[in-house]
Amino acid sequence: MSPERRPADIRRATEADMPAVCTIVNHYIETSTVNFRTEPQEPQEWTDDLVRLRERYPWLVAEVDGEVAGIAYAGPWKARNAYDWTAESTVYVSPRHQRTGLGSTLYTHLLKSLEAQGFKSVVAVIGLPNDPSVRMHEALGYAPRGMLRAAGFKHGNWHDVGFWQLDFSLPVPPRPVLPVTEI
């Protein structure tokens, strides 16, 4: 049985959200191969990343009944300037809110923001196997682009990493990507 769908408020993430975000992500670090980190993170790491990236990349949280229930955010795909129009996307939903559509809702808001900003494409990196994540990404329009075999070792096993990409239609040459605050 799926958990009950509750209305979610999707908004920009703030520094005050990062302890809750850290708790959500640490669950996946400790219990799964969704995240290839092997040690839990501290809230300050999340705060530092948010402050460093939020002007250029959207960071969104979903609040349900006053609690942070998930996060979707983007960051740079690679550090070279030619990649400026490609972002990497990530989404995490608290275990209590899985299978409620919240991940797709968060991702839809994130993708609308990235497209409005002028990004050309978005890459998702998925630790495999992870059928629910693959299904969600493909339902949102991502297409598989490749795989690295046995790229990460976690929980006593080697795991593949898959790459999915969503392309937006943009002119050539592209215009500069807009800051998050200008969309």
From Swiss-Prot:
GO molecular function: phosphinothricin N-acetyltransferase activity
Catalyses which reaction(s): phosphinothricin + acetyl-CoA = N-acetylphosphinothricin + CoA + H(+)
Keywords for this protein: Acyltransferase, Antibiotic resistance, Genetically modified food, Herbicide resistance, Transferase
InterPro entries: Acyl_CoA_acyltransferase, GNAT_dom
Highest taxon of the lineage: Bacteria
Domain annotation N-acetyltransferase: ranges: 8-173
EC number: 2.3.1.183
Pfam family, one: Acetyltransf_1
Uses in industry and biotechnology: Introduced by genetic manipulation and expressed in glufosinate-tolerant maize by Dekalb Genetics.
Annotated residues for binding of acetyl-CoA: 91-93, 99-104, 130
A GO biological process held by the record: response to antibiotic
Matches recorded under Gene3D superfamilies: 3.40.630.30
Family statement: Belongs to the acetyltransferase family. PAT/BAR subfamily.
Function: Inactivates phosphinothricin (PPT) by transfer of an acetyl group from acetyl CoA. Can also acetylate demethylphosphinothricin but not PTT or glutamate. This enzyme is an effector of phosphinothricin tripeptide (PTT or bialaphos) resistance.
PANTHER family associated with the record: N-ACETYLTRANSFERASE, UPF0039 PROTEIN C11D3.02C
Protein name per Swiss-Prot or TrEMBL: Phosphinothricin N-acetyltransferase
Organism lineage string: Bacteria, Bacillati, Actinomycetota, Actinomycetes, Kitasatosporales
Gene name linked to the record: bar
